[in-house]
Protein backbone atom coordinates (compact mmCIF):
# COMPACT_ATOMS: atom_id res chain seq x y z
CA UNK A 1 0.00 0.00 0.00
CA UNK A 2 2.10 2.89 -1.25
CA UNK A 3 1.93 6.10 0.73
CA UNK A 4 0.07 4.69 3.76
CA UNK A 5 0.69 6.97 6.74
CA UNK A 6 0.03 6.27 10.42
CA UNK A 7 0.13 9.05 13.04
CA UNK A 8 0.55 7.96 16.66
CA UNK A 9 0.26 10.62 19.35
CA UNK A 10 0.26 10.35 23.11
CA UNK A 11 1.66 11.72 26.38
CA UNK A 12 5.10 11.09 27.86
CA UNK A 13 5.73 7.49 28.83
CA UNK A 14 2.76 6.08 26.91
CA UNK A 15 5.13 3.82 25.00
CA UNK A 16 4.40 5.33 21.60
CA UNK A 17 7.99 5.21 20.33
CA UNK A 18 8.66 1.59 21.35
CA UNK A 19 5.27 0.50 20.06
CA UNK A 20 5.60 2.44 16.79
CA UNK A 21 9.06 1.00 16.21
CA UNK A 22 7.82 -2.57 16.77
CA UNK A 23 4.80 -2.11 14.51
CA UNK A 24 6.94 -0.57 11.77
CA UNK A 25 9.41 -3.46 11.86
CA UNK A 26 6.67 -6.07 11.71
CA UNK A 27 4.95 -4.39 8.76
CA UNK A 28 8.06 -3.28 6.88
CA UNK A 29 7.23 0.39 7.37
CA UNK A 30 9.48 3.36 8.15
CA UNK A 31 9.36 4.60 11.76
CA UNK A 32 10.01 8.24 12.63
CA UNK A 33 10.26 9.29 16.29
CA UNK A 34 9.66 13.06 16.29
CA UNK A 35 10.18 13.31 20.04
CA UNK A 36 13.80 12.29 19.49
CA UNK A 37 14.21 15.28 17.17
CA UNK A 38 13.08 17.72 19.88
CA UNK A 39 15.42 15.98 22.29
CA UNK A 40 18.26 16.50 19.81
CA UNK A 41 17.58 20.25 19.75
CA UNK A 42 17.51 20.25 23.56
CA UNK A 43 20.84 18.42 23.64
CA UNK A 44 22.37 21.02 21.34
CA UNK A 45 21.00 23.84 23.51
CA UNK A 46 22.63 22.27 26.57
CA UNK A 47 25.93 21.61 24.79
CA UNK A 48 26.04 25.17 23.42
CA UNK A 49 25.14 26.57 26.86
CA UNK A 50 22.55 28.95 25.44
CA UNK A 51 19.87 30.74 27.45
CA UNK A 52 17.19 28.10 26.97
CA UNK A 53 14.41 30.56 27.85
CA UNK A 54 15.35 32.88 24.97
CA UNK A 55 13.74 31.74 21.72
CA UNK A 56 16.14 33.82 19.60
CA UNK A 57 19.02 31.66 20.86
CA UNK A 58 17.72 28.71 18.83
CA UNK A 59 18.69 30.30 15.52
CA UNK A 60 21.61 27.87 15.50
CA UNK A 61 19.13 25.46 13.91
CA UNK A 62 19.67 27.31 10.63
CA UNK A 63 23.16 25.79 10.49
CA UNK A 64 22.49 22.34 11.95
CA UNK A 65 21.17 19.24 10.23
CA UNK A 66 18.94 17.05 12.40
CA UNK A 67 17.75 13.90 10.67
CA UNK A 68 16.06 10.62 11.58
CA UNK A 69 16.98 7.57 9.57
CA UNK A 70 17.32 3.82 10.08
CA UNK A 71 15.83 4.16 13.60
CA UNK A 72 18.58 6.56 14.66
CA UNK A 73 18.57 10.29 15.36
CA UNK A 74 21.49 12.22 13.88
CA UNK A 75 22.94 15.65 14.51
CA UNK A 76 25.01 16.08 11.39
CA UNK A 77 26.84 12.75 11.11
CA UNK A 78 26.69 12.07 14.86
CA UNK A 79 24.28 9.48 16.27
CA UNK A 80 22.92 10.84 19.57
CA UNK A 81 20.53 8.09 20.70
CA UNK A 82 22.10 7.74 24.16
CA UNK A 83 22.77 11.43 24.83
CA UNK A 84 19.19 12.55 24.16
CA UNK A 85 17.86 10.22 26.87
CA UNK A 86 19.77 11.98 29.67
CA UNK A 87 17.90 13.50 32.63
CA UNK A 88 19.05 16.99 31.66
CA UNK A 89 17.46 16.63 28.22
CA UNK A 90 14.28 15.10 29.67
CA UNK A 91 13.95 17.97 32.15
CA UNK A 92 14.15 20.65 29.44
CA UNK A 93 12.63 19.17 26.29
CA UNK A 94 9.09 20.44 27.02
CA UNK A 95 10.42 23.99 27.33
CA UNK A 96 12.44 23.75 24.13
CA UNK A 97 9.57 22.23 22.17
CA UNK A 98 7.21 25.02 23.26
CA UNK A 99 8.96 27.66 21.12
CA UNK A 100 7.20 28.41 17.78
CA UNK A 101 10.51 28.79 15.94
CA UNK A 102 11.76 25.37 17.07
CA UNK A 103 8.48 23.69 16.20
CA UNK A 104 8.33 25.38 12.80
CA UNK A 105 11.82 24.18 11.86
CA UNK A 106 11.23 20.61 13.01
CA UNK A 107 7.73 20.31 11.56
CA UNK A 108 9.21 21.25 8.17
CA UNK A 109 11.70 18.39 8.50
CA UNK A 110 9.03 15.99 9.74
CA UNK A 111 6.62 16.79 6.92
CA UNK A 112 9.42 16.20 4.43
CA UNK A 113 10.09 12.82 6.04
CA UNK A 114 6.35 12.20 5.90
CA UNK A 115 6.54 12.07 2.12
CA UNK A 116 8.17 8.65 2.50
CA UNK A 117 5.91 5.76 1.53
CA UNK A 118 4.44 3.61 4.33
CA UNK A 119 5.46 5.45 7.49
CA UNK A 120 4.58 5.39 11.16
CA UNK A 121 5.34 8.72 12.80
CA UNK A 122 4.92 9.24 16.54
CA UNK A 123 4.90 12.35 18.68
CA UNK A 124 2.47 14.78 20.27
CA UNK A 125 1.08 16.74 17.33
CA UNK A 126 1.39 14.32 14.42
CA UNK A 127 -2.31 13.77 13.76
CA UNK A 128 -3.20 17.42 14.36
CA UNK A 129 -0.30 19.36 12.80
CA UNK A 130 2.43 17.31 11.12
CA UNK A 131 0.35 14.73 9.23
CA UNK A 132 -3.26 15.94 9.43
CA UNK A 133 -4.00 13.84 6.33
CA UNK A 134 -2.66 10.58 7.83
CA UNK A 135 -4.58 7.47 6.75
CA UNK A 136 -4.84 6.30 10.36
CA UNK A 137 -4.52 8.36 13.54
CA UNK A 138 -4.05 6.73 16.93
CA UNK A 139 -4.01 8.45 20.32
CA UNK A 140 -2.16 6.20 22.75
CA UNK A 141 -2.83 6.66 26.45
CA UNK A 142 -2.03 4.93 29.74
CA UNK A 143 -2.54 5.62 33.44
CA UNK A 144 0.10 7.96 34.92
CA UNK A 145 1.30 5.38 37.46
CA UNK A 146 1.60 2.73 34.76
CA UNK A 147 3.61 5.12 32.60
CA UNK A 148 5.86 5.85 35.57
CA UNK A 149 6.36 2.10 36.16
CA UNK A 150 7.41 1.64 32.55
CA UNK A 151 9.80 4.58 32.73
CA UNK A 152 11.25 3.18 35.97
CA UNK A 153 11.79 -0.20 34.29
CA UNK A 154 13.57 1.49 31.39
CA UNK A 155 15.87 3.29 33.82
CA UNK A 156 16.55 0.09 35.77
CA UNK A 157 17.45 -1.66 32.53
CA UNK A 158 20.01 1.11 32.01
CA UNK A 159 21.42 0.55 35.50
CA UNK A 160 19.69 3.46 37.28
CA UNK A 161 17.39 3.41 40.29
CA UNK A 162 14.61 6.00 40.21
CA UNK A 163 11.86 6.66 42.77
CA UNK A 164 8.41 5.87 41.32
CA UNK A 165 6.73 8.82 43.06
CA UNK A 166 9.28 11.22 41.62
CA UNK A 167 8.63 9.81 38.15
CA UNK A 168 4.88 10.26 38.63
CA UNK A 169 5.50 13.88 39.58
CA UNK A 170 7.74 14.46 36.55
CA UNK A 171 5.31 12.82 34.11
CA UNK A 172 2.34 14.76 35.51
CA UNK A 173 4.29 18.00 35.13
CA UNK A 174 5.26 17.04 31.58
CA UNK A 175 1.62 16.30 30.72
CA UNK A 176 0.60 19.76 31.93
CA UNK A 177 3.33 21.51 29.97
CA UNK A 178 2.61 19.56 26.79
CA UNK A 179 -1.17 19.98 26.90
CA UNK A 180 -1.18 23.64 27.91
CA UNK A 181 1.43 25.09 25.54
CA UNK A 182 0.08 27.63 23.04
CA UNK A 183 1.73 26.12 19.96
CA UNK A 184 0.72 22.59 18.90
CA UNK A 185 -0.45 21.35 22.31
CA UNK A 186 -0.82 17.64 22.98
CA UNK A 187 -4.38 16.74 22.05
CA UNK A 188 -6.32 14.02 20.29
CA UNK A 189 -7.20 14.62 16.66
CA UNK A 190 -10.96 14.48 16.15
CA UNK A 191 -10.67 11.41 13.92
CA UNK A 192 -8.07 9.58 16.03
CA UNK A 193 -8.75 6.19 17.61
CA UNK A 194 -7.93 6.03 21.33
CA UNK A 195 -5.90 3.01 22.46
CA UNK A 196 -5.52 2.63 26.25
CA UNK A 197 -2.49 0.45 26.97
CA UNK A 198 -2.70 0.65 30.78
CA UNK A 199 -3.52 -3.06 31.12
CA UNK A 200 -1.80 -4.21 27.93
CA UNK A 201 1.73 -5.48 27.41
CA UNK A 202 3.95 -4.03 24.71
CA UNK A 203 3.22 -6.94 22.39
CA UNK A 204 -0.52 -6.78 23.04
CA UNK A 205 -0.54 -3.09 22.15
CA UNK A 206 1.55 -3.76 19.04
CA UNK A 207 -0.93 -6.46 18.00
CA UNK A 208 -3.88 -4.11 18.55
CA UNK A 209 -2.35 -1.36 16.41
CA UNK A 210 -1.43 -3.80 13.64
CA UNK A 211 -5.07 -4.90 13.61
CA UNK A 212 -6.18 -1.27 13.32
CA UNK A 213 -3.78 -0.69 10.42
CA UNK A 214 -4.93 -3.81 8.63
CA UNK A 215 -8.55 -2.87 9.19
CA UNK A 216 -7.96 0.64 7.85
CA UNK A 217 -6.05 -0.27 4.72
CA UNK A 218 -5.77 -4.03 4.32
CA UNK A 219 -2.73 -6.14 5.09
CA UNK A 220 0.20 -3.87 4.24
CA UNK A 221 2.89 -6.57 4.28
CA UNK A 222 1.21 -9.04 1.91
From Swiss-Prot:
The keyword Cell cycle does not apply. Keywords: ATP-binding, Cytoplasm, Kinase, Nucleotide-binding, Transferase. GO terms for molecular function: ATP binding; CMP kinase activity; dCMP kinase activity. GO terms for cellular component: cytosol. It is found in: Cytoplasm. Its EC number is 2.7.4.25. It comes from Acholeplasma laidlawii (strain PG-8A). One of its GO terms (biological process) is nucleobase-containing small molecule interconversion. The keyword Protein biosynthesis does not apply. HAMAP family: Cytidyl_kinase_type1 (MF_00238). It comes from the Bacteria. It catalyses: CMP + ATP = CDP + ADP; dCMP + ATP = dCDP + ADP. Pfam families: Cytidylate_kin. Belongs to the cytidylate kinase family. Type 1 subfamily. This is Cytidylate kinase. InterPro entries: Cytidylate_kin, Cytidylate_kinase_dom, P-loop_NTPase.
Amino acid sequence: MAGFKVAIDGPAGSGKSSISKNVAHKLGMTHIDTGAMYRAVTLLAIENQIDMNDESQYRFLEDVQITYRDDHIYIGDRIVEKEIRSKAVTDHVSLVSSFPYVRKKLVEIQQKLGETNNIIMDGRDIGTVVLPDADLKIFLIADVRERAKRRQQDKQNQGYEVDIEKLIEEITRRDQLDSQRKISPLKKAEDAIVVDSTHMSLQQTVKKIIELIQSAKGVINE
